[in-house]
Amino acid sequence: MEQELNRLGVLAHSATDAQRKRLVENLRDLMISLETIDDTLERIVHTPFEIDGAKIGVNLGIFRTLTQSDASMDAETLAKMTGADPDLLVRLLRYFASARMIAEHGSDSFAANKVTRALASAKGESYVDVFYEMVLPTIHELPNFLERTHYRNPTDRYHLSFQDAFNWEGDLFTFFEADPHRQVLFNRHMQLQRSSITNWGTMATLLATNQSPDAVLLVDIGGGVGHQCERIRANCPNIQGRLILQDLPEVMKNALPIPGVEAMAHNVFEPQPIKGAKFYYLRGVLHDFPDDQCKEILRGIVGAMGVDSTLVIDEMILPDRNINWQATVMDLQMMANFGSQERTRSHWVRLIESTGLMLRDVLYHGLDEYQGLIIAVKTM
């Protein structure tokens, strides 16, 4: 049996990313099929311990400390380095090892592994902090919220499990305005999470038009402080034309000073002020809103589009069946926090066609299973 498992490991190292993901899913199915009823129940009910344990490890700096050395460390050494009580720390270390967050090489001997390095990274710490402080409280309230609302699909962003979790009357955006600490956590997480899911070869080809340097090439609508505009300038250096970054006034106060990018305050629910741009770009914006509000946003853009304008929607495009667990979890997060959702291709088509647009193409980035560019033009 060990030989078969080793053979799978070798196969995984030479597989494409799509093959690797299929292998992971198949092995997950196999693992579940081997569980007893008690195994299954224990796995499900104890899942919250992983994020709680990871948060403790991040707070203590355990993962960072272990990754700074190639050698194993004992609990006493780690206690001195972290300031934790040795008796407590050894119990935590045993849990981390059992959850495969760290490696246990012997009695009282612990070291970093692949998971440790992931949790010690800036992206890993950001994931843990944001999910522990912001996502989990909202998801924890979701069962009670759905029961209380008689299992109706939530679409009112002011009446969600998010409001129940944080005793808040406004939406998530006003919550951030009142809580700068969580706003910083969220912005940092968004920057790190989305930094590696754009296929820059695809983007460069799309944006390579014979545009006048004085004409507007792209309007990044709801683009935050400008991280994606910065990446566009860095990864597509030969494109011609102006880049305009738009977001709310309070966001634009912190816009990055990016050469070749103009910052402009704009609310997505107001008519688009830039007329006749070559590309209007919405990245991760529409999944924050239910369909009715998305239609309002899209109609505001359609009114500004010229005959040569193209709308580019950069989002997840889900299949109609066999959606992976990561995407379904994201969909439930959007429901609980925004009253919105992730959408299938057929849903996207219905949405854009209802606002005077027609689908021209879908270009998948190929770096994430479902992330892609929805290319739409104005119906004439």
UniProtKB/Swiss-Prot annotation:
Extra remark: In the absence of ucdC, its substrate, the terphenyl triol intermediate, is unstable and is partially reoxidized to atromentin. Most of the terphenyl triol intermediate is very likely converted to non-detectable products.
Family annotation (InterPro entries): COMT-like, O_MeTrfase_dom, Plant_O-MeTrfase_dimerisation, SAM-dependent_MTases_sf, WH-like_DNA-bd_sf, WH_DNA-bd_sf
Chain's role: Nonribosomal peptide synthetase that mediates the biosynthesis of usterphenyllins and uscandidusins, p-terphenyl derivatives. The pathway begin with the biosynthesis of 4-hydroxyphenylpyruvate (HPPA) from L-tyrosine, possibly by the aminotransferase ucdG. The nonribosomal peptide synthetase ucdA then condenses two HPPA units to produce atromentin.
MF terms (GO), sorted A to Z: O-methyltransferase activity; protein dimerization activity
EC numbers, comma separated: 2.1.1.-
Protein name per Swiss-Prot or TrEMBL: O-methyltransferase ucdC
Pfam families, per database record: Dimerisation, Methyltransf_2
Native source organism of the sequence: Aspergillus ustus
Keywords: Methyltransferase, S-adenosyl-L-methionine, Transferase
Family named by the database record: Belongs to the class I-like SAM-binding methyltransferase superfamily. Cation-independent O-methyltransferase family. COMT subfamily.
Gene Ontology terms: biological process: methylation; secondary metabolite biosynthetic process
Pathway linked to the protein: Secondary metabolite biosynthesis
Residues that bind S-adenosyl-L-methionine: 222-223, 247, 283
Knocked-out gene: effects: Impairs the production of usterphenyllins and uscandidusins and leads to the presence of trace amounts of atromentin.
Catalytic EC class: transferase
Active site per database record: 287
